[in-house]
From Swiss-Prot:
Record-annotated active site: S49 (charge relay system), H90 (charge relay system), D115 (charge relay system)
Protein name: Signal peptidase complex catalytic subunit sec11
Cytoplasmic side: 1-14
Residues exposed to the Lumenal side: 36-172
Gene name tied to this protein: sec11
Keyword list, A-Z: Endoplasmic reticulum, Hydrolase, Membrane, Protease, Signal-anchor, Transmembrane, Transmembrane helix
UniProt comment concerning the protein's domains: The C-terminal short (CTS) helix is essential for catalytic activity. It may be accommodated as a transmembrane helix in the thinned membrane environment of the complex, similarly to the signal peptide in the complex substrates.
């Protein structure tokens, strides 16, 4: 069962394989960030505020390279609110002015009111600099795993334990 302890070369190879997988995932994430010009090129929909367009758990792909083009009313954007860590996925419903200093108002498709209550205190609108990216594609329900892991922390422990067990018991 613990035969990997008897063969340090095999144990080192398994550790290096695991490190290779982690570094590859990190490089892919950073590559997507640079290509899309977005700090978070992939986000998960955390609430039902954008139904029926997007369901809770949908994985969204963002693009932020259209800096020369104006953000258009009707676009679905992901933006950060000053002082809050969770990005919000909502539709741009009104625009005041033009250019990088235009004032933007957003609203969830499934919400009755606009997002002024979600913005930071004293902030009535968001600006282009608050936008992380525009949604260019999605995969339904794939992000639900991250929601489950954040809502049920014990699942992280179970999952990490199972992954560790697989690494320990794996034979080459």
């Amino acid at each position: 069962m613990l035969s990997f302890l008897q063969n340090p070369r095999q144990a080192a190879a398994q550790v290096l394989n695991f490190a290779l997988i982690l570094s590859t995932a990190f490089m892919m994430w950073k590559g997507l960030s640079v290509a899309s010009d977005s700090p978070s090129p992939i986000v998960v929909v955390l609430s039902g505020s954008m139904e029926p367009a997007f369901q809770r758990g949908d994985l969204l792909f963002l693009w932020n390279r259209n800096l020369l083009e104006e953000t258009k009313v009707g676009e679905i954007v992901v933006y950060n609110v000053k002082g809050k860590d969770i990005p919000i996925v909502h539709r741009l419903v009104r625009k005041f002015g033009a250019g990088p200093k235009a004032k933007l108002l957003t609203k969830g498709d499934n919400n009755v009111a606009d997002d002024t209550e979600l913005y930071a205190r004293g902030q009535d609108y968001i600006e282009r600099e608050d936008i992380i990216g525009s949604v260019v594609g999605y995969i339904p329900f794939v992000g639900y795993v991250t929601i489950l892991l954040s809502e049920h922390p014990w699942l992280k422990t179970v999952m990490l334990g199972m992954m560790g067990l697989v690494v320990v018991l794996q034979r080459e």
